[in-house]
């Protein structure tokens, strides 16, 4: 009899939780989509000829403890200041120096939100893509903050992400997702549906236009040196695309990246630098193919357990045609959000750290690993 009771208890201990799990799965309204086949390009990933796979070996840390998750950075050459937005709402200014110990961090303006993308307007103003507020204009050396726009076509921005400024003053920016907020970022990725938009704001007419919609987490953006097109990143698709401004058409700029792109910067010297918060992971590749796995992951994420691990972050350098030139990464590195080449240094913002990373490209260059 005790044996029978023990066997029955064992069966119940397995069946009951299983039935409960099935019921919870069925009742959960999260409905991930089948991801387009061009997302499955990991096997076709081609690495550039030059590689530095020990990024952290030469990395220096700027503003340790004074910069609370500095996601994006923008360099103002005339003042030798880096502007960066932090998770506590502060746009901070960092005086850069040859020695990281001589760098000075200043609390400049608090937006009352979460500043992400940062760029400079044609009149010296600072343009901020604030994830909670919308597109902001900070002028008068920080004395005036103005909301430029927070909606388009009657749809409020949920995740104002990155911004770039054309020579004629027009602002181009991304709303990564009109459905999910920054804190729900993983749910946007897991659902596998295109909620992102590419937009423009004309300061003269005050008109906000939707240039493209149905993008997969529209992230970083920059304008080409000849001002003819934009380059924007779609993170889960591992690609960056061109949008021709006058022709209003799109084509792939670079794809099959070795990681998931965040921000992109032009260095003024014929190259773009693409930040990769994480390298390609096997778990994510498998999840992309099977919506039910993404639903399970999302259900777990709602209880505060994030299974979307980020690892082997880095920076990819490409030429004006999108051809990979050099790849700087490290298996121990994660959450690189942006990168800006300033002189001989590469400066990187982060999605998780309390500092800006700096790498001396002359001392720690990418090298030909095939030699």
From Swiss-Prot:
<dbReference type="GO" id="GO:0009753">
    <property type="term" value="P:response to jasmonic acid"/>
</dbReference>
<feature type="glycosylation site" description="N-linked (GlcNAc...) asparagine">
    <location>
        <position position="285"/>
    </location>
</feature>
<comment type="similarity">
    <text>Belongs to the strictosidine synthase family.</text>
</comment>
<feature type="glycosylation site" description="N-linked (GlcNAc...) asparagine">
    <location>
        <position position="137"/>
    </location>
</feature>
<dbReference type="Pfam" id="PF20067">
    <property type="entry name" value="SSL_N"/>
</dbReference>
<protein>
    <recommendedName>
        <fullName>Protein STRICTOSIDINE SYNTHASE-LIKE 7</fullName>
    </recommendedName>
</protein>
<dbReference type="GO" id="GO:0005773">
    <property type="term" value="C:vacuole"/>
</dbReference>
<keyword id="KW-0597">Phosphoprotein</keyword>
<dbReference type="GO" id="GO:0009751">
    <property type="term" value="P:response to salicylic acid"/>
</dbReference>
<feature type="signal peptide">
    <location>
        <begin position="1"/>
        <end position="25"/>
    </location>
</feature>
<feature type="glycosylation site" description="N-linked (GlcNAc...) asparagine">
    <location>
        <position position="101"/>
    </location>
</feature>
<dbReference type="Pfam" id="PF03088">
    <property type="entry name" value="Str_synth"/>
</dbReference>
<feature type="modified residue" description="Phosphotyrosine">
    <location>
        <position position="303"/>
    </location>
</feature>
<dbReference type="InterPro" id="IPR018119">
    <property type="entry name" value="Strictosidine_synth_cons-reg"/>
</dbReference>
<keyword id="KW-0926">Vacuole</keyword>
<keyword id="KW-0732">Signal</keyword>
<dbReference type="GO" id="GO:0009615">
    <property type="term" value="P:response to virus"/>
</dbReference>
<dbReference type="GO" id="GO:0009620">
    <property type="term" value="P:response to fungus"/>
</dbReference>
<dbReference type="GO" id="GO:0009611">
    <property type="term" value="P:response to wounding"/>
</dbReference>
<dbReference type="InterPro" id="IPR011042">
    <property type="entry name" value="6-blade_b-propeller_TolB-like"/>
</dbReference>
<dbReference type="GO" id="GO:0009723">
    <property type="term" value="P:response to ethylene"/>
</dbReference>
<keyword id="KW-0325">Glycoprotein</keyword>
């Amino acid at each position: 009899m005790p044996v029978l009771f023990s066997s029955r208890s064992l069966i119940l201990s397995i069946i009951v939780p299983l039935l409960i799990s099935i019921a919870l799965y069925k009742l959960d309204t999260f409905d991930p989509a089948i991801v387009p086949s061009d997302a499955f390009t990991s096997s076709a990933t081609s690495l550039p000829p030059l590689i530095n796979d020990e990024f952290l070996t030469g990395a220096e840390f700027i503003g340790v403890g004074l910069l609370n998750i500095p996601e994006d950075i923008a360099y103002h050459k005339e003042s030798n200041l880096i502007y960066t937005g932090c998770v506590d709402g502060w746009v901070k200014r960092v005086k850069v120096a040859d020695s990281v110990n001589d760098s000075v961090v200043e609390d400049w303006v608090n937006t009352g939100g979460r500043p992400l993308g940062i760029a400079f307007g044609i009149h010296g103003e600072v343009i901020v893509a604030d994830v909670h507020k919308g597109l902001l204009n900070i002028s008068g050396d920080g004395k005036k903050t103005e909301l430029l726009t927070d909606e388009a076509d009657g749809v409020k921005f949920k995740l104002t992400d990155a911004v770039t400024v054309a020579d004629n003053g027009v602002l181009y920016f991304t709303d990564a997702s009109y459905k999910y907020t920054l804190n729900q970022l993983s749910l946007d990725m897991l659902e596998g549906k295109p909620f992102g938009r590419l937009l423009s704001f004309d300061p003269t007419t005050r008109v906000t236009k939707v240039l493209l919609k149905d993008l997969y987490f529209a992230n970083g953006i920059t304008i080409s040196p000849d001002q003819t097109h934009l380059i924007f990143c779609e993170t889960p698709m591992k690609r960056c695309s061109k949008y021709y401004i006058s022709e209003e058409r799109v084509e792939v700029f670079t794809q099959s990246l070795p990681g998931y792109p965040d921000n992109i910067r032009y260095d003024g010297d014929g190259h773009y630098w693409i930040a990769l918060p994480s390298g390609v992971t096997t778990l994510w590749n498998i999840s992309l193919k099977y919506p039910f796995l993404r639903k399970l992951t999302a259900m777990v994420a709602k209880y505060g357990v994030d299974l979307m691990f980020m690892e082997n972050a880095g920076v990819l350098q490409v030429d004006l045609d999108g051809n990979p030139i050099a790849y700087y990464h490290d298996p121990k590195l994660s959450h690189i959000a942006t990168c800006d080449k300033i002189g001989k240094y590469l400066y990187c913002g982060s999605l998780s750290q309390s500092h800006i990373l700096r790498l001396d490209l002359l001392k720690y260059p990418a090298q030909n690993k095939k030699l």
